[in-house]
Amino acid sequence: MPDESKMCFMTVANRPYQKYVPWFLYFLNRAYPKAHKLVLLDVALADNIRQMLTLLSGNFEVRERAFPEYTHTDANTIKCLRWLTFEPAFEQYDCMSIGDVDMATYVETPPYMDQHLAHCDQLGIPYSNFIRPPQAGPRRMSGIHVIKPREWFAAMRPMINKYRPMLKAGQIRLPEQGFNEQLLLHMVLESSLGEPPANLSETYWPSLATSNHHGTHIRLAECGGIRGLQGAKGYRNHKPEILAAVKTPLFRQLSAMSPQIGGILAAIARAYENF
């Protein structure tokens, strides 16, 4: 059984997305308390977000001004920077999830780490992801990328060293749709890892207990309510976790300080009660 303390969930947030950081941590602390959580920000924490974080305990770090070459970032840039960040400390982990900050992650059986490591081991590669279907636009991966850090960064550090200054200089030329996910695939193709296995996507989904979201994509819920979530495979499986999560005193405290997101999550829970 993999050791949960050897798991790291890493994400990034620019100023408009800081509002999701406390919620990202709240749900991960419930789901996988021993796992490390790392949030990299482009600017300083807003005062209201800092106050929310004082309510949280657990194994997490929120790092301000984490990208010294930037004073601030736009959405495309911050999403690309998650693929273009390496620290030696990452190599202490057996598994690392690099994904979106606007996620409420729930505990699953088997756990998140086990699901993705099984996919890696099945294909003999150091990453678990899929190629989006052709109807989704330019060929690219998804924005939730799970890796075996030691092997992944051994192959990817030359790509990081190449593309991070190119990103800053505006020299990466890719179509706008899914820009950061195209960059991720481009880095894989150009690295020693090469072309992903032909059966990458078809083996990905059976490896998962529910979906690649492993919970609720809060931004989808903001945009479309429960209908916005119904496109995620296995979304019904999360009913017990979301119902329990919205009933805690800590959830009520966070909601009082972040009523928009708290209200959305409470509304989603009410919708789940009807399933």
What does each model-found stretch correspond to?
Residues R15-Q18, A104, W152:
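Short acidic, S/G/P-rich loop/turn micro-motifs used as interaction or catalytic elements
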Residues M1-Y70, E91, E273-N274:
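N-terminal anchoring/stem segment of glycosyltransferases
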Residues M10-R15, L40-V43, N76, I98-V101, ...:
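Short His-Asn-centered micro-motif
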Residues D121-K148:
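Short beta-strand-to-loop element that shapes/binds the nucleotide-sugar donor at the catalytic cleft/hinge
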Residues I144, R150-I264:
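Catalytic core and acceptor-binding pocket of nucleotide-sugar-dependent glycosyltransferases
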Residues I78-Y127:
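GT-A fold catalytic core of metal-dependent nucleotide-sugar glycosyltransferases
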Residues N76-W83, G178-L183:
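Conserved glycosyltransferase catalytic-site signature
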Residues P68-A75, F130-P134:
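A short glycine/serine-rich beta->alpha loop
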